[in-house]
Amino acid sequence: MSQYYLYQDLSKCIACYSCVIQCKSIKQLPVGPKPSEIVTIGPRMIDQRPRAAYVFMPCFHCDNPWCVAVCPTGAMQKRPEDGIVFVDADRCVGCRLCMNACPWGAPQWNPETGKVVKCDFCKDRLDQGLKPACVTVCTTQCLFFGRIDEMPEEIREKFKESIGAKVVEVP
């Protein structure tokens, strides 16, 4: 399991895309690949007003990542010390098996390099004691990042409540 946790306060996100843009910028990516994405939920009418929610979707850094399991060269790896799933670009041959294996679409094709890229929680920044780039530029401070055991209880409770409130029965 990833030891890190990225929480989004859905009530604060305005879909400004600064997190997505900063991710692409710091990874020097061309148009096309998006290691993180904002998914719009809605709009739906709440109190006779249209409302939408914007969900930030980076890689989930799965416990047993299918992308790692199918990679024939070992380019897609999971760091044992913290569970971060990342691509070793020197080993990637561009076969795209990881892209087909991931149900979330986290691995993305970079047409300029002919290799796969993905969210790695900015592991190089983490190793320097910094937060991921997406968190540092969030204009509404709706993104929180940390180790699961260090995440404040109120954030964990708010996450539980916000996700539970967004689950609705579909007729």
Residue ranges of predicted features:
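Non-ligating segments of multi-cofactor redox enzymes
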Residues: M1-P171
